[in-house]
A protein has these predicted regions:
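Short edge beta-strand/loop segments characteristic of extracellular beta-sandwich folds
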Residues: 161-163
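Extended extracellular/luminal ectodomain segments enriched in beta-structured repeat modules
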Residues: 152-159, 228-229
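N-terminal targeting leaders for non-cytosolic proteins
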Residues: 24-144, 152
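C-terminal motif of bacterial Sec signal peptides marking the signal peptidase cleavage site
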Residues: 14-17
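Short coil-to-beta strand junction motifs in C2/discoidin
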Residues: 171-193
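Sec-dependent signal peptide recognition
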Residues: 2-9
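Bacterial signal peptide processing site
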Residues: 19-21
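Terminal, low-complexity interaction segments
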Residues: 190-245
Length: 245
């Protein structure tokens, strides 16, 4: 069962890299332009890693891929399972219409139905279940050294745009078939995204919903206060909780 905590982000992501000689370069996330509607979770036939987990409900198969943008600097963990996109990872998509084919039962599309610059954007699930074979990874973006991709590099992040997914927005506004009106937000409810620097010593909060005011546009989040960091980590909290969180 998915939590409410699923959002869409990173249609545009701007950050600066500073070298020892103060030669500052600015990088902007550069995502693929897909010719057809796509939910890109990496090479599903030849994943970087795979494993299975057995429970009383049966066996779930997992696949792990690393996704990078055109610059090779932004690195995203992508985990998919027997049931599709996993709850704590990233994927690329350009789905912008109501009837995008081949999506899993949950609606991962941006409520805006488009990106900020082009129609490709990044989705992230940050439900708090952890990812990876050893359950030791958080939903995080890592920054690779432009000259040495085997190493992480500190960058000053300017910010990024975020918005709600169709699923999160609809559940807050109308409820879903699982819990009905219990999920509908009232005046005292909130849905908050927290973005940390890589070692989680600093953070920035951004509200995706405050009361019945639900975010339905791309919203710029200033991250300059995080200083230099080797990546970003994400968590989501909501006043609406159930037995799954």
């Amino acid at each position: 069962m998915k939590k409410l905590s699923l959002l869409l982000l990173l249609s545009v992501f701007i950050f600066c890299g500073c070298s020892d000689d103060d030669d500052t370069k600015t990088y902007i996330l550069s995502l693929p332009n897909y010719e057809t509607h796509t939910l890109d979770m990496g090479d599903q036939e030849n994943p970087d890693d795979s494993w299975s987990v057995s429970s009383e409900w049966g066996t779930t198969n997992y696949k792990y891929n690393l996704l990078t943008d055109a610059s090779g600097i932004f690195e995203f963990d992508c985990v998919s399972s027997t049931y599709g996109f996993y709850s704590d990872s990233f994927a690329f998509t350009n789905c912008t219409v109501e009837d995008c084919p081949d999506f899993a039962s949950y609606d991962y599309r941006a409520i805006t139905k488009k990106g900020v610059i082009n129609n490709t954007y990044v989705i992230v699930g940050a439900a708090g279940y952890k990812i990876g074979k050893n359950s030791d990874k958080e939903a995080a973006i890592r920054f690779r050294d432009h000259d040495n991709p085997n190493e992480l590099e500190d960058y000053r992040v300017k910010g990024l745009y975020v918005t709600n997914s169709v699923y999160a927005y609809s559940s807050m506004k109308e409820g879903t078939g699982y819990y009905g009106e219990e999920e509908i937000f009232g005046s005292n409810d909130s849905f908050k995204l927290t973005i940390y620097n890589y070692d989680k010593t600093m953070h920035v909060d951004c509200y995706l919903a405050e009361g019945t005011n639900l975010l339905d546009q791309w919203k710029w989040v200033d991250l300059t206060s995080l200083g230099e960091t080797k990546g970003l980590k994400f968590s989501l909290t909501s006043t609406k909780k159930n037995e799954y969180g």
